[in-house]
Amino acid sequence: MARNIVVEEIVRTPVEMQQVELVERKGIGHPDSIADGIAEAVSRALCREYIRRYGVILHHNTDQVEVVGGRAYPRFGGGEVVKPIYILLSGRAVELVDQELFPVHEVAIKAAKNYLKNAIRHLDVENHVIIDSRIGQGSVDLVSVFNKARENPIPLANDTSFGVGYAPLSETERLVLETEKLLNSEKFKKEYPAVGEDIKVMGLRRGNEIDLTIAAAIVDSEVATPKEYLEVKDKIKEAVEELAKEITSRKVNIYVNTADDPERGIYYITVTGTSAEAGDDGSVGRGNRVNGLITPNRHMSMEAAAGKNPVSHVGKIYNILAMLIAEDIAKTLPVEEVYVRILSQIGKPIDQPLVASIQVIPKPGHSVKEFEKDAYSIADEWLANITKVQKMILEDKISVF
């Protein structure tokens, strides 16, 4: 059965040629990214435990996580958290399997704690955080699950929804993405342990000049004085300047912690490395899209991918798939830009979308007719192998924020 794939030329100014471009990334320690990370960690942990016990992923969606900011008194040399961060795990998961209870809450809380321990080094998970699992219950008869799987080897869409992806990344997008990844890399943290994980990078390109505004939480126990704090800021700037030279020949202006006011004793210091300790709240889906960026110059989906089940939830699967299709087309065909939109219809097989729209801006001297069939084939092959996306997610080969 032929798939509903439409390839067409789109008439628009490529992002690199637009006068103004805005790009944002919320780093792994940002409250919104903490919510995304926990939601996804819980989903993946449930998937693995369901498979271990029953040989199949049972229905769940854990994409409702709220991070409620705590209260802290940071000070140079080391402060304290006086009110813990409250994290609410919500959503739905099968808890009753053939009249036997599955430990949803235990699996979820353990996954959340492990994620936080690995993601935010200076956060004391036992004392700085309260994790409350209110994940709703569901029940299932395994025989009916296996029978349904035999009848429908390709999962049926659980919603009418769309996913969006594009490629390639612009220089500004790459710079914003790689800046946060550098500052939160294991190597950089070993060299500069004072740099916390709550790093937000905002990029603005005007013509051929890029402004990068970086908000980086500095850990108070790692800096004894304002002088040491300012030295860390300088190191951040120097590292990003070197990175920028590798990515772009455009002029790049770098600003770090611009709200600081040394004369009034105002510095961006934290006890834990995240602003969640100081009243900043976070929610799933309020941050980065599946490519790790927030890009108002591009098509975007408003779906929160983190925490959704990787079997049939098109809000997750189609956003990832659209990105993968776009990346393959951009790598292999003569296009300036490609945008992919995939729309499901509830109850229909996820490999048969209502439409897969591929919009391209051909490179100068090329036309869509030259590679229309190739673009179609790339999308068709990914859709035919759509269950690969689930495998990539469970093997931690894909991040969704």
Curated annotation (Swiss-Prot):
Its EC number is 2.5.1.6. The keyword Heme does not apply. GO terms for biological process: one-carbon metabolic process; S-adenosylmethionine biosynthetic process. Keywords: ATP-binding, Magnesium, Nucleotide-binding, One-carbon metabolism, Transferase. Pathway: Amino-acid biosynthesis; S-adenosyl-L-methionine biosynthesis; S-adenosyl-L-methionine from L-methionine: step 1/1. ATP binds at residues 136-141. One of its GO terms (molecular function) is methionine adenosyltransferase activity. Pfam families: AdoMet_Synthase (PF01941). It is an enzyme of class 2 (transferase). It catalyses: L-methionine + ATP + H2O = S-adenosyl-L-methionine + phosphate + diphosphate. Its cofactor is Mg(2+). Belongs to the AdoMet synthase 2 family. NCBIfam families: PRK04439.1-3 (NF003364), PRK04439.1-5 (NF003366). Catalyzes the formation of S-adenosylmethionine from methionine and ATP. This is S-adenosylmethionine synthase. The lineage of its organism: Archaea, Methanobacteriati, Methanobacteriota, Thermococci, Thermococcales. The gene is mat.
